[in-house]
Amino acid sequence: MPDRPAFIVSAASVPEDAHVYPQSTEAMGPTRSLGAAAGLQRIGINLQRLPPGTRSSWPHAESDEEEFVYVIEGEVQAWIDGHLHPMKAGDLAAFPAGTGVSHCFINNSERDALLLVGGDVARPSNRIFYPLNPTRRQDLPEALWWHDVPPRALGPHDGLPDARRGMAP
């Protein structure tokens, strides 16, 4: 039998990485970068585990990168422009580029959730906007901040998992 090609990867062999934004101590749900491990350069494919009380990222919108989130296991709440929408295994949320729709995914349940997250990989033309975290702008090169994001009204939800309310940023 020939050796297994490098473009076939096992999720268990790809290490998890838990991102922490500058100016914060909150670890986002850990991610396995499957697409990068398999050699993909234009499409990002990530397996993200959201333990109870975590979220996928800070709420954000992107100017020139499409993104999707598919729930493999468990239940999450999609934070969309300040409103929560329940999602369960088998549900998909898709974010076309340039709409200004801000989003993140929150696990307020009592068990892990598993998400398949995919989209474009770091396009040079892409800009990003964090509606609830404007101080993020100082951590990014000016050229990466989305200045002319389409205006969208935000709902009342603060974007935090229930377990994080009242904790240090």
Locations of regions flagged by a protein language model:
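Ligand-binding loop in jelly-roll beta-barrel domains
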Residues: 97-125
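Short acidic-glycine-tyrosine-enriched beta hairpin
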Residues: 82-98
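Short beta-strand segments
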Residues: 57, 85, 126-128
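A short, N-terminal "cap"/entry segment at the start of jelly-roll beta-barrel domains
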Residues: 1-42, 128-169
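Short hydrophobic/aromatic patches on the structural cores and recognition surfaces of FHA
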Residues: 74, 90, 105
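Conserved short histidine dyad/triad with adjacent acidic residue
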Residues: 28-33, 46-62, 100
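Short, conserved beta-strand element in jelly-roll/cupin
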Residues: 47-51, 61-79, 118-121
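A generic structural signal for short beta-strands and their flanking turns/coil linkers
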Residues: 30, 41-46, 65-67, 74, ...
